[in-house]
A protein has these predicted regions:
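Generic structural hydrophobic/aromatic packing signal, biased to beta-strands
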Residues: 50, 62, 89-91, 103-105, ...
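Short, solvent-exposed loop/turn segments that connect beta-strands within catalytic domains
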Residues: 110-116
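Residue-level marker of positions within ordered structural domains that often coincide
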Residues: 67, 108, 126, 178
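Nuclease-adjacent, charged terminal/linker segments that flank catalytic cores
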Residues: 1-100
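A general structural motif
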Residues: 116-117, 181
Length: 188
């Protein structure tokens, strides 16, 4: 099956819109509204692959991909709090000895600093093996502006590493949140 980078700088590879072309030229991440932060030693500009096509499906590779229009946060707020009102989201909240929560969502009383409830949010995306091949596909696209969807760049998805790291975090962070009687949402 074909394997290739399918979304670069926030736009599917087939998207030839002015917005897509501008994002690629400026290396702009529309999900974070800033320059793409991903690096590769194989290119002199940000490694803007958000998603890869493999095994007939799209796999998100960048956690910022989940930030599109705040949809994840709205869904979690509606699911957990029943509303999107009086919500604040903080990123990279430190927990000494454990690590950081990707995000903490706080529901506060209206027009108040009193916290009613909070949840932690963790984002987990795919990781690749033979990433140099994915970079090769990215470079080909950036040079030509197109891809052949039948082409295979021989990278892989390291599912074992994803779940190994995620499981460790679930244990460590889950113990703390269980003591606090709070929930954690995993976006995978």
């Amino acid at each position: 099956m074909a394997k290739y980078p399918s979304e670069m700088f926030g736009y599917y590879w087939k998207d030839a819109s002015k917005e897509a072309q501008s994002a690629r030229k400026k290396h702009h991440c529309p999900f974070h509204d800033s320059e793409c932060f991903k690096k590769s030693r194989l290119v002199d500009y940000p490694f803007g692959v958000c998603t890869a096509h493999t095994d007939g499906k799209e796999i998100a590779l960048c956690p910022r991909r989940f930030l599109e229009n705040g949809i994840v946060f709205k869904d979690i707020a509606k699911t957990h709090f029943g509303s999107i009102h009086n919500i604040l989201v903080f990123s990279e909240v430190g927990l000494p000895g454990i690590g950081n929560f990707d995000f903490v969502m706080v529901k506060h009383k209206p027009l108040s600093t009193i916290v009613e409830d909070f949840v932690a949010i963790e984002l987990q995306t795919g990781q690749t093996t033979s990433t140099g091949k994915l970079v090769e596909g990215f470079k080909d696209f950036m040079e030509s502006g197109t891809l052949d969807p039948e082409t295979t760049y021989n990278f892989g998805i390291n599912t074992y590493d994803i779940w190994k790291r995620t499981f460790t975090q679930i244990l460590n962070k889950g113990i703390i949140l269980e003591k606090w009687r709070r929930k954690i949402f995993w976006v995978v």
